[in-house]
Amino acid sequence: MNYDETNNELFQESNMQELKYGERNILEGELITFPNPRIGRRYEINISLPEFTCKCPFSGYPDFATIHIKYIPNERVVELKAIKLYINSYRERYISHEESVNQILDDFVAACDPLEVKIKGDFLPRGNVHTTIEVEHYKAS
């Protein structure tokens, strides 16, 4: 390992130590799942996350939304604290409304492979414009 690599690792390590525990949890956050306790039973799970924030990739202004997730689980169910931390990881990202909701769908499907999922991002009005983005995924039969 050369001098620059060593300094970079030490810098990253010291920055991680300076972070508050919640910030570390968000940075390390990933969508964690557990086995569906009722495989074979078709039931719906609804999750509402009212504190979604990201930054506009054009202006840098914050955007605020409620993310609604409605899904029918397959073999895995998403763990609620993990999805909260995952959603919080968007807070400092420069990302459009459209891309954020589509990325959440992609990551959700990759993590728990639901039979069906619908994700809705209901963004607070900005500049007198109210945006709602809805995306869906259906598992191929």
UniProtKB/Swiss-Prot annotation:
Substrate binds at V78, E79, L80, H97, E98. It catalyses: 7-aminomethyl-7-carbaguanine + 2 NADP(+) = 7-cyano-7-deazaguanine + 2 NADPH + 3 H(+). GO terms for cellular component: cytoplasm. Keywords: Cytoplasm, NADP, Oxidoreductase, Queuosine biosynthesis. It is found in: Cytoplasm. One of its GO terms (molecular function) is preQ1 synthase activity. GO terms for biological process: queuosine biosynthetic process; tRNA modification. The active site is at C56, D63. Its EC number is 1.7.1.13. Pathway: tRNA modification; tRNA-queuosine biosynthesis. Pfam families: QueF (PF14489). It comes from the Bacteria. InterPro entries: GTP-CH-I_C/QueF, NADPH_dep_7-cyano-7-deazaG_red, QueF, QueF_type1. Catalyzes the NADPH-dependent reduction of 7-cyano-7-deazaguanine (preQ0) to 7-aminomethyl-7-deazaguanine (preQ1). Belongs to the GTP cyclohydrolase I family. QueF type 1 subfamily. This is NADPH-dependent 7-cyano-7-deazaguanine reductase. It comes from Trichodesmium erythraeum (strain IMS101).
